[in-house]
Amino acid sequence: MVTTLILLGIFSQIRNLLLVIFDVEGVLLDEEYLPILAEKLNKEDEIWEITKQGIQGKINWEEGLITRVAALKGLDEKICQEVADNLPIMTGAKEACRILKASGWKIMAVSGGFTLMMDRLQKELDLDYVYCNDLIFNNGKLEGVKINVDSDKSKPAKIKIAEWGEKKEDIVCVVDGANDIKLFDICELGIAYRAQDLVKDLATTTLEEKDLSKILNIINKHFNLKLETTV
């Protein structure tokens, strides 16, 4: 009996080390930020085309980001913040994060997006850590971008993974774009969520239903767990 309790305690500790890494736009958020911001300057078609090419891996992601932000130069900082504050959270994201956190999981978000949208998201979803880029403002006007997260999102993620002592076999990644695929190198379970074909080809499994809480079923099956699931 004592041996059984000890083993159960060890198993519980191991399970508590599990980590989910999410992409943000198109995964935790149900919109792409810059194309919506571009509507303020009637440049949504131009910005969305560059965004799509970056997501699909057809252009250099960093250059595409710099080009998109440059096209929006001069936008008022208050407008940028207002748009960020009103980005819709993905269906099922709150439920998924709530259940994961209640079960002892850590949650990280790695985004090519920006601090002014990630601060809000971190609070609302109780994320343990976020990595993202920063928009640069000068006298209240959009000036440029500071790139902290490039096309290899695994680089910043590895820093916190090492700090937390996470193991690859205990990590899940949920992503949708070509600029996310290197995250699959550092995880046990890679989920392509409503993703580009390139991402689907490299993922462990895919989820097409627009409900992020359905990843819980996938996680349960893969790790033989019994996390709470939604109907």
Regions found by a protein language model. Give the residues of each.
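N-terminal amphipathic/basic-hydrophobic helices that include classical n-h-c signal peptides
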Residues: 1-16
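Short, basic/polar N-terminal leader/transit segment immediately after the initiator methionine
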Residues: 3-4, 19-22, 214
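Alpha-helical substrate-recognition element adjacent to the catalytic core
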Residues: 14-134
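C-terminal cap/substrate-recognition subdomain and adjoining C-terminal extension
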Residues: 84-231
